[in-house]
């Protein structure tokens, strides 16, 4: 058993010695002084022999022993030295540590009764106990304390109970099972140490051991606690301090000690190695002698005092020049390609602008001399930024004419951006005329067009944004936030009639919408109706009575007479409005496969109910109870007149508006504005004098679709 203990101590000493036994070329001791005692290097301020140490506290006595390995003694503290910390020459490490033997404190150990003292007193010396040491207790039933001048500053307990033994790592580390370790509180710089051991349970016998050591007893350094009662010594790490303020130089770095005045701990600066306590003891490290000491790689290493530098060789310089030139060439080509791509994009935008009638728009707006609102022309970049590059998440709706996106302009204004699908070149002139005409319309119930963009392949229109969905959604997908009462429906019908009447008769050039339906009636934040989507709307010369165009519109709303004759008149919009009135009355969709084939169209379904006096049966259940029956009957009769197969028997939009306005005014207890003769102001839409409108008369073309008759519109064109 004693042999095993000796082997353990030898292993610990060899580990400490090997850590700092690397061969060094710098002087450790003063000139003509021995720097070794056996295999242990002895650095200054320690020394062997008179005149070789700083003062008496650092005197080393090299004493021969029977096992042929000399013992290093510090006579002033009566302790044996095991090794010195020579520091790391390649980092600023403080060069002020050494290691001594210290006896263990035993209690209740029959084999070690003669070794019961573990006290250490360093008062008056330049030495103090390093905070790297750990207070250690070994044995069963042990309660140990570290004492400093009568005060217990650290303690721990050990037991052999099964509850701790089952803990993972209990047999290979000091966690309380037969062994425990505690760190010393930092910054104390203790010079006095003693240990006290007690029994946890007085009635139980056992051997208790306590000591101070710089080793952490775990892993490969773990010693079974049973062996520690046979141990005599362990090693303690000590540090020293000296008044060396005069030593600081470019090669030596000394830092003051917080607790001891005029006390310093020194080290060599980075790039130097040696003993900082010897004048001239820090010498330059030649980093170029070993590739591992520098980072020059293939470059030439040149040693300088305290450091090194890397110089490029001619091949390296040539390689670097070629690499830099290649990078500059690549960067230049990238800039050239970027500029060329930018030039192509700008050229393409100019091409689209001219092809889409941009020059014509500029020419026509110049004729107006600022007498009317000019059409704002947006750049493609403006609208890309406004719509986040036409992100799919910004889509408000899609239809036969194109896709509508929600956007925000630079000034914070929210707009609706309509990206059309296609436009024929022969219709561009008429398209520009329509933009100018529609941009001058200013009516509270008409969605205002704010401008356009002609730099894209297909022109883009910008409208005011209407936030509160369309009438179709409110009728067929109702929400509790906005109930569609009869009063609201009558108000919406009156507002839509007002807008269409304005377009038909209150402007100098009548405009036919040609696609009146509930999805094209938007509701703003105040639930005011706004007529939108003029994608297929057309203006007509004041002396003309109709347009002759390709048949377009939405099934369920299209005038049957228009389908047969290709002639679109203001009465065709009246027919579509009549279907809209029925939609408001019944809450039914304009086309439904759930109805019989002959009444799938809402108009036919309504007329059949009127003939059979079943109007009350088809009314929307949401308005049956609260509506005024006389008002409902009056609106139903007005809708029947609007659906007359002979357009001459239909009322004009002006007549429809007067009738609805009278009903609404009567409901509010006021006199109708229309009855009082307060007509719409006749708005003069300015057009260039050189422009007149005429229309071609193509054959009927109807799309093969069960729900839509959307086709490309025939635009009015300039006469020669």
Swiss-Prot record:
Species, as recorded: Arabidopsis thaliana
Q: Where does ATP bind?
A: 396-404, 418
Q: Which residues form the active site?
A: 515
Q: Which residues are glycosylated?
A: 32, 39, 147, 171
Q: Which GO terms describe its cellular component?
A: membrane
Q: Where is this region: Atypical EGF-like?
A: 252-310
Enumerate the Pfam families for this protein.
Answer: GUB_WAK_bind, PK_Tyr_Ser-Thr, WAK
Q: Which residues carry this modification: Phosphothreonine?
A: 549, 554
Catalysed reaction(s) here are: L-seryl-[protein] + ATP = O-phospho-L-seryl-[protein] + ADP + H(+); L-threonyl-[protein] + ATP = O-phospho-L-threonyl-[protein] + ADP + H(+)
List residues modified as Phosphotyrosine. Answer: 463, 562
Quote the record's domain comment.
Answer: The EGF-like region is specific to this family of proteins and seems to consist of the C-terminal of an EGF-like domain fused to the N-terminal of another one.
Where are the disulfide bridges?
A: 254-266, 288-301, 296-310
Q: Which InterPro entries match?
A: EGF_Ca-bd_CS, Kinase-like_dom_sf, Prot_kinase_dom, Ser-Thr/Tyr_kinase_cat_dom, Ser/Thr_kinase_AS, WAK, WAK-like, WAK_GUB
Compartmental location: Membrane
**Extracellular-side segments:** 24-315
* Signal peptide extent: 1-23
| GO molecular function terms noted in the UniProt entry | ATP binding; calcium ion binding; polysaccharide binding; protein serine kinase activity; protein serine/threonine kinase activity
Q: What is this protein called?
A: Wall-associated receptor kinase-like 8
| Keywords tagged on the record | ATP-binding, Disulfide bond, Glycoprotein, Kinase, Membrane, Nucleotide-binding, Phosphoprotein, Serine/threonine-protein kinase, Signal, Transferase, Transmembrane, Transmembrane helix
Membrane topology category: Single-pass type I membrane protein
Q: Does the keyword Signal apply?
A: yes
Q: Which GO terms describe its biological process?
A: cell surface receptor signaling pathway
Q: Which Gene3D superfamilies match?
A: Laminin (2.10.25.10), Phosphorylase Kinase, domain 1 (3.30.200.20), Transferase(Phosphotransferase) domain 1 (1.10.510.10)
